[in-house]
A protein has these predicted regions:
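Repeated loop/turn-to-beta-strand initiation elements of outer-membrane beta-barrel proteins
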Residues: 50, 84-89, 122-126, 163-171, ...
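Glycine- and aromatic-enriched membrane insertion/assembly motifs of diderm outer-membrane
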Residues: 65-98, 110, 186-188, 197-200
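Detector for outer-membrane/organellar transmembrane beta-barrel domains
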Residues: 36-38, 43-44, 48, 147-225, ...
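Residues on the lipid-exposed face of transmembrane beta-strands in outer-membrane beta-barrel proteins
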Residues: 42-44, 75-79, 89, 113-117, ...
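Transmembrane beta-strands of outer-membrane beta-barrel pores
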Residues: 44-50, 91-97, 119, 134-138, ...
């Protein structure tokens, strides 16, 4: 794989890490990992909100001046099984703090494991992939960490590379449907689109922009400032990212985002720092 395409894929993989607090999947990349190669990406993320969009989309402060913040530490891994298949896994840990709650909460949340199948490619420039993911809660009797329900997701992604303003570029589009299997378990449509651009001929520095969101539907319409617990909501988020590659095996990425609009969700501001390692 050419260095440019390789680093574009890495940038897309890590630039969306900041979305962990709304449980957006890490495994959206469309460019394949070589057979026998292992990708490891630890990250630290931050989420903050002190206002919300209500069920009609009207923005207002949290009651009684409440504030919610969350710090997450996540390990993402991806292993190339063959030219067509890859194994992916995500293990997140969060520390949640709502100012009006009696005490913060922390712990492992939902383990995600999946298989990605590369359906086809066009001249090794454009790639189509399909991924199935299983969601397994790693906690019990702690509603502040998530739904506590098993689930499954099916996601389709389309990725490609090219040139813009004389510089190498790439894009990725992904859309997935996720179902949780418990009481009032929501069904969700999760989507994102990313465009990235290299800033130099050696592919050492890159920037990207991303639009992402979730539409979640459930009979449970209640709202909580803790976003992992809401079941019926929607939001659209914009983010920018910067990546620096020290080598083909080691890269560092920064990203930040802002929720633009939503329903029954907090008005979130996000940031993340991620390290990419390949063996």
């Amino acid at each position: 794989m050419k260095p440019g395409k390789y680093l574009f894929r890495v940038l897309f993989l890590t630039v969306i890490l900041f979305t962990t607090f709304q449980n957006l999947s890490y495994a959206d990349g469309g460019f394949p990992v070589r057979p026998g190669r292992l990708l490891i990406s630890p990250s630290v993320s931050y989420f903050f909100a002190n206002s919300e969009w209500d069920s009609t989309g009207v923005k207002k402060p949290f009651p009684n001046g409440g504030k919610f913040s969350s710090i997450g530490v996540t390990l993402y891994t991806e292993y190339g099984i063959s030219r067509r298949f890859a194994f992916v896994a995500t293990l997140p840990y969060v520390y949640n703090n709502y100012s009006l709650a009696t005490a913060p909460s922390s712990g492992l949340t939902d383990l995600e494991t999946g298989i990605r199948y590369y359906l086809a490619n066009i001249n090794f420039v454009y790639y189509f992939s399909l991924q199935g993911t299983a969601i397994t809660p790693l906690y019990t009797n702690n509603a502040s960490l998530g739904y506590g329900e098993e689930g499954a997701e099916l996601k389709l992604a389309f990725s490609g590379s090219g040139h813009l303003f004389g510089e190498s570029s790439y894009f990725n589009l992904a859309d997935g449907v996720r179902q949780y299997f418990g009481t009032d378990g929501p069904i969700q449509n999760r989507f994102n689109g990313t465009f990235g651009l290299s800033l130099d001929k050696k592919f050492m520095n890159q920037i990207s922009v991303t639009l992402s969101g979730i539409n979640s539907f459930s009979n449970n319409k209640s709202f909580s400032p803790i976003p992992q617990t809401d079941k019926d909501f929607s939001f659209l988020q914009a983010s920018i990212g910067y990546g620096h590659s020290f080598s083909h095996e080691v890269s560092l990425f920064l990203s930040g985002g802002q929720f633009l609009t939503g329903r029954n969700t907090g008005v979130g501001t996000t940031a993340s720092l991620a390290l990419y390692l390949q063996a």
